[in-house]
């Protein structure tokens, strides 16, 4: 007779023990004297899981909007052991992000972020303080300033030309537009970040994609932090460790390559040649500079480079795909945008970064796209640094704060026909997307506003200008514009559920000479 196999019972046994532990905690909490805290209103909670079932929706930003319509624009939720607050009005978004910005300047740190970014180094997930302020200064003054973005114009134009040639080679056949956009963005980001020639780029891009696929995953370890056994049972940990080991080794090799290249190519009193003035070179100069006010380590550099790749592709590609989708569905907008681009750029064979400033209607299209389809509908969550009060309600310390900028951009109190795609609504309007108008904050606002707005917006405008200038477009399969679905898929960004499949036809061929 075979020996009985009891090992298969171990997971069930552990889950039973954990369930009983959480149940006892819940009963103790229920029986303990009620606190005098006045929490924001919110939907009823289930034992142990709280409101997790309501956040398990495939489109949590839409679900939170429906709940806010019932419970109010400042709403309390319980996600396992984590207190969470959802903000769904411009007035309260301003209160949280600006008026009391310091109280909400931290970020929650997930298991994935801790493991992939050297315990949350870098500017995105690090705690608010001196370290974060120093890194923010590096981004603002060195890496992603308007001057720095302008210096990448040749790179952007070269890679844009390559993308146009690639689309031309498939003219008359259906293409998945997002594939072309992501290829352009990875190529541009690689050169701007690491330089023209660098071994390991392909692995970096591959791991970036795999990490993005995991980045939105919430583990039991994140939502029940007091249950330490979840750290051992978490199936994400081995996957993420494997990814981290790959990316850490690749980035270490890339740094070593760059150091050797800079040592051998240094001329004219340590001035870098134009092709070597990439972001990694800037970071290495800061690391090596004895007089530098901001000191960085190799681990800081690796975290910064990796988060640039994580953040620099999804948002821009998603925005362009949504803009093209909206224009395909609204042919009059497409016609008007194409007419402007072709009139302004008449006779040109290649598009330059400097041309974009003349395309006023295209900029309205981008603004309207970001209103309806912000790259991160719930922004990156904030964390309350200490118990405080907002609008007469207590916000607990360590509460996760989610600002629903998708709901803000569709608030009928601030937008006429809020669900309609109408770029003209921004004509003669002072509203911008740099965090000054809280009914419209697709990139966030306050201290932790996205530092890459200039880089991202420039790429979006260049891509749209090229697509509209060089090509005419029709939907694949003979689909009528009114039948194009606009379903969303929530993930690292809020993308189309069904990728946009279109057929390009060449209108104005590209040419090597400008």
Curated annotation (Swiss-Prot):
InterPro entries: CYP450_71D (IPR052306), Cyt_P450 (IPR001128), Cyt_P450_CS (IPR017972), Cyt_P450_E_grp-I (IPR002401), Cyt_P450_sf (IPR036396). Pfam families: p450. It catalyses: tetrahydroalstonine + A + reduced [NADPH--hemoprotein reductase] + O2 = alstonine + AH2 + oxidized [NADPH--hemoprotein reductase] + 2 H2O + H(+). Its main location: membrane. The chain crosses the membrane at residues 4-24. Glycans are attached at residue 428. PANTHER family: CYTOCHROME P450 71AV8-LIKE, OS08G0105600 PROTEIN. Belongs to the cytochrome P450 family. This is Alstonine synthase. It comes from Alstonia scholaris (Dogbane). The lineage of its organism: Eukaryota, Viridiplantae, Streptophyta, Embryophyta, Tracheophyta.
């Amino acid at each position: 007779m075979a020996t009985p196999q009891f090992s298969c019972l171990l997971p069930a046994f552990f889950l039973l023990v954990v369930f009983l532990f959480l149940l006892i905690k819940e009963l103790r909490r229920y029986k303990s004297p009620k606190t005098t805290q006045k929490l924001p209103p919110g939907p009823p909670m289930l034992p142990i899981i709280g409101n997790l079932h309501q956040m398990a929706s495939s489109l949590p930003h839409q679900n939170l909007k429906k709940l806010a319509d019932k419970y109010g624009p400042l709403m309390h939720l319980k996600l396992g052991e984590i207190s969470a607050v959802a903000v769904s009005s411009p007035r309260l978004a301003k209160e949280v992000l600006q008026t009391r910005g310091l109280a909400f300047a931290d970020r929650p740190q997930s298991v994935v972020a801790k493991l992939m970014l050297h315990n949350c180094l870098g500017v995105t997930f690090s705690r608010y303080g001196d370290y974060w302020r120093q890194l923010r200064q590096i981004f603002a003054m060195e890496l992603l300033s308007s001057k720095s973005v302008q210096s990448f114009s040749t790179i952007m134009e070269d890679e844009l030309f390559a993308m146009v040639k690639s689309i031309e080679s498939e003219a008359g056949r259906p293409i998945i537009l997002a594939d072309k956009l992501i290829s352009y963005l990875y190529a541009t980001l690689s050169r701007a970040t690491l330089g023209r020639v660098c071994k390991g780029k392909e692995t970096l891009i591959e791991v970036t994609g795999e990490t993005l696929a995991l980045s939105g995953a919430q583990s039991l370890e994140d939502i029940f932090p007091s249950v330490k056994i979840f750290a051992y049972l978490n199936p994400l940990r081995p996957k993420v460790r494997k990814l981290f080991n790959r990316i850490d080794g690749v980035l270490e090799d890339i740094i070593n390559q760059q150091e050797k290249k800079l040592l051998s190519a240094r001329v004219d009193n340590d001035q870098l040649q134009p092709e070597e003035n990439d972001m990694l070179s800037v970071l290495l100069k800061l690391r090596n500079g004895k007089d530098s006010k901001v000191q960085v380590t190799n681990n800081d550099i690796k975290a910064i480079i990796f988060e640039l790749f994580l953040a620099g592709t999804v948002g821009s590609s998603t925005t362009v795909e949504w803009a093209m989708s909206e224009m395909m569905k609204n042919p009059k907008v497409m016609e008007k945008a194409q007419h402007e681009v072709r009139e302004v750029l008449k006779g040109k064979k290649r598009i330059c970064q400097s041309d974009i400033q003349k395309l006023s209607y295209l900029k309205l299209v981008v603004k309207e796209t970001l209103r309806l389809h912000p790259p991160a509908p719930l922004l990156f969550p904030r964390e309350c640094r200490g118990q405080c009060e907002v609008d007469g309600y207590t916000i607990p310390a360590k509460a996760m704060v989610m600002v629903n900028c998708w709901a803000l951009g569709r608030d009928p109190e601030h937008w006429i026909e809020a669900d309609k795609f109408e770029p003209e609504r921004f004509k003669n309007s002072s509203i911008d997307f740099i965090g000054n108008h809280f009914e419209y904050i697709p990139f966030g606002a306050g201290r932790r506003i996205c530092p890459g707005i200039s880089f991202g917006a420039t790429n979006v405008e260049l891509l749209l200008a090229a697509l509209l200038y060089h090509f005419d477009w029709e939907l694949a399969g003979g689909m009528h514009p009114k039948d194009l679905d606009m379903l969303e898929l929530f993930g690292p960004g809020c993308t189309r559920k069904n990728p946009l499949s279109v057929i390009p036809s060449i209108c104005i061929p590209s040419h090597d000479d400008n």
